[in-house]
Amino acid sequence: MARLNELYNKEMVPQLMKDFNYRNVMEVPKLEKIVVNMGLGEAIQNVKILDSAVDEMAVITGQKPIITKAKKSIAGFKLRQGMPIGCAVTLRKDKMYEFLDRLVNVSLPRVRDFKGISGKAFDGNGNYSLGVKEQLIFPEINYDKIDKIKGLNITIVTTAKSDEEGKALLKLFGMPFRN
């Protein structure tokens, strides 16, 4: 069992039950999944960029990503329907907790001029989205082997009913929010 999962079951559930006056353990918000997405507009001209992105994401998450394709054609971007334009990974259960642990304790502190993450990126239902400008913050990525700096989106999906509950849950997991 992942370290954060154990911490959640032993310490966070009683804490959240006390803070939000839940009567039942099943009411307590929990992590459902983490979606890591990398959109690559440059993949239209150069397919090799997509291959390196898939390899990097597999190393970061520990799971093979799926290649996302364009839903419809856009002439202005020289994009045709079905062209590969990115990759995504959905993490659940132990892999999700392991990834969150590495993100909070290792990767985010490696961001340059890091002052904490914004508390305003919740969607209204307790889910949090975070943008990372470069994949180099992850220690698994070898600096010498990357061909291009790519950003990625990380969405943390919770069962929380409100942003306040979601923020309290993520704070207990150690997410470094700005004030």
From Swiss-Prot:
Listed GO biological process terms: translation
Gene Ontology MF term list: rRNA binding; structural constituent of ribosome; tRNA binding
UniProt keywords, alphabetically: Ribonucleoprotein, Ribosomal protein, RNA-binding, rRNA-binding, tRNA-binding
InterPro entries: Ribosomal_uL5, Ribosomal_uL5_bac-type, Ribosomal_uL5_C, Ribosomal_uL5_CS, Ribosomal_uL5_dom_sf, Ribosomal_uL5_N
GO-annotated cellular components: ribonucleoprotein complex; ribosome
Gene3D superfamilies the record matches: 3.30.1440.10
Pfam families from the UniProt entry: Ribosomal_L5, Ribosomal_L5_C
PANTHER family assigned to the protein according to its UniProt record, in alphabetical order: 60S RIBOSOMAL PROTEIN L11-RELATED (PTHR11994)
Complex formation: Part of the 50S ribosomal subunit; part of the 5S rRNA/L5/L18/L25 subcomplex. Contacts the 5S rRNA and the P site tRNA. Forms a bridge to the 30S subunit in the 70S ribosome.
Functional description taken from the UniProt entry: This is one of the proteins that bind and probably mediate the attachment of the 5S RNA into the large ribosomal subunit, where it forms part of the central protuberance. In the 70S ribosome it contacts protein S13 of the 30S subunit (bridge B1b), connecting the 2 subunits; this bridge is implicated in subunit movement. Contacts the P site tRNA; the 5S rRNA and some of its associated proteins might help stabilize positioning of ribosome-bound tRNAs.
Family note: Belongs to the universal ribosomal protein uL5 family.
Protein name (record): Large ribosomal subunit protein uL5
